[in-house]
Amino acid sequence: MLELRLVQGSLLKKVLEAIRELVNDANFDCSGTGFSLQAMDSSHVALVALLLRAEGFEHYRCDRNLSMGMNLNNMAKMLRCAGNDDIITIKADDGSDTVTFMFESPKQDKIADFEMKLMDIDSEHLGIPDSEYQAIVRMPSSEFMRICKDLSSIGDTVVISVTKEGVKFSTSGEIGSANIVCRQNQTIDKPEEATIIEMQEPVSLTFALRYMNSFTKASSLSEQVTISLSSELPVVVEYKIAEMGYIRFYLAPKIEDDEEMKP
């Protein structure tokens, strides 16, 4: 038996909006410690990892580990029927091929039940090792979203370069080129507006902007985004979900032509 009650129902709606463009079908894994998802996008370029810890739910019951295959677009349609202030409960019986979403209005004068068929989805769990990164950038998520959106009007890729000067986002396309530099600034009274750069060594990597723009759909979940970069590893774009967990996006860098790689 599975029963999860989330007072901030809007949180689940935001999570779905953040990932459904990248991933069509995915398994939600429930265990005694939390509700999680790990899935590749259809082109196997990006990976999404979500964790909502059990402590963040008002009520969390998971008698045994359960994996529920869901079509995320169908799930998003159901969640759109919930009001932003509604309390959402997810229920599933052991061995059942359906999951029930229950939406309660805050005054509890209206309760709606939606039942959705589960799917059998073959998915392999990738072990994601904890790695040391050459550079870690923390910045306002709204700023990162704006930069990715602005650069998309010029080019298809973004070069993210971290040096002691700051973090630079660059692109070029048929109409020209653009560079946006963010320098470290720590706002004591407004930590959510700070840009903090931890650099072991300079790093410069190229990524597809369409994926970065897709990742920024998670901006509504967190005021800050953390971007972890290393030349040998996929970038990690992480949004913390207040007191509950995180959503992380992993994206392999684009390899430049050999000619361009020569110093």
Swiss-Prot record:
Has UniProt tagged this entry with the keyword Disulfide bond? no
Protein's GO biological process: leading strand elongation; mismatch repair; regulation of DNA replication; translesion synthesis
- Keywords from the named record: DNA replication, DNA-binding, Nucleus
A GO cellular component term found in this entry reads: PCNA complex
Q: Does the keyword DNA-binding apply?
A: yes
Q: Where does the record locate the signal sequence feature?
A: none
Molecular function (Gene Ontology), one example:
DNA polymerase processivity factor activity
Against InterPro entries, the record matches this protein to:
DNA_clamp_sf, Pr_cel_nuc_antig, Pr_cel_nuc_antig_C, Pr_cel_nuc_antig_CS, Pr_cel_nuc_antig_N
Kindly name one Pfam family recorded for this protein: PCNA_C
Q: Which residues bind DNA?
A: 61-80
- Where is it located? Nucleus
The UniProt entry's sequence similarity note says: Belongs to the PCNA family.
What exactly does this protein do? This protein is an auxiliary protein of DNA polymerase delta and is involved in the control of eukaryotic DNA replication by increasing the polymerase's processibility during elongation of the leading strand.
Protein name stated in the entry: Proliferating cell nuclear antigen
Organism from which the protein derives: Zea mays
